[in-house]
């Protein structure tokens, strides 16, 4: 499983077993909005405020979750899955030279680990996805990857701007 960057503004393709599952697209160059289609439903991630500290997750015009960034860069992803159950995940950024982005659930169990695939010779924004089988088989897993990919690209953009 991996996330392949298609542009520098944050667009990416999510592949699972060498098959394209979905593509996340930013409609305008400096737009903080992101749009994708998953399970024949339109999913939009859009900023709630000017500062970019809260993003809304909107499915088919109905608010279904949020991505919250506090002043210490603690990031929480909250969304309602297909079974109408609230899912909450927290980001932990590990490493300095070799970064890893770990997303854990409320119980503290690591669900997804995203690792950048770049080296000092070749700079890319692609990410490898690692997860245990009991989580990768969950119905909400692919949807969670959308939000995790968006968050990691957001962090990389903050770091590039010197905000972090």
What label would you give each PLM region?
Residues 24, 32-67:
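Acidic (E/D-rich), amphipathic helical modules within compact regulatory domains
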Residues 1-33, 38-40, 71-74, 79-164:
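Low-complexity or membrane-interfacial segments used for flexible interactions
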